């Protein structure tokens, strides 16, 4: 017999919170990769689900990180989407210096394909979302594939060459350090 001890947070009954698991796949260059798959709590592998792809470098480090159900300025609200029957995929991306966009393609697309092969992804309803560095990668991806029904590329720098001499906000530094040697990984002076 189950005894209810408390009715704290009754608003939570309106959410299908979702579960998260680690998935394995192989990049187009043969590297073993991982990603996070977020599914509605009532997930049925025989059903088809719309899928949102959301990524920013490495996501698997956040396997045990709780995401609060709130609006974010640069990401999606995970509980909002799982409560509405979406699965969410966060693939890890491993970069090759000099080829940041191609690196994203080589990791993200085979990750999506591996989930499609499992049979529960509605291939007519796959969306992708990313912000800043993720936005740049999405701007690249949508020029290389038609797999996405919808894409949101927030605050991307789609042309690093034209922004190369700009000033990185809050730092006073030229963006060239960021583009050549840190996150953007173009690997040298254009």
Model-inferred region functions:
Residues 2, 11, 44, 61, ...:
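Flexible, glycine-rich phosphate/dinucleotide-binding loops
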Residues 54, 67-190:
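Active-site-proximal cap/loop segments of hydrolase catalytic domains
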Residues 1-47, 71, 76:
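Non-catalytic accessory segments flanking enzyme active sites
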Residues 43-48, 52-72:
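Short, surface-exposed "cap/lid" segments of acyl-processing enzymes
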Residues 31, 49-51, 87:
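Hydrophobic core residues within well-ordered beta-strands of beta-rich domains
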Residues 7, 27, 57, 93, ...:
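Active-site donor-binding loop signature of nucleotide-sugar glycosyltransferases
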Residues 3, 49-51, 124:
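Extracytoplasmic/periplasmic beta-strand context in beta-sandwich domains
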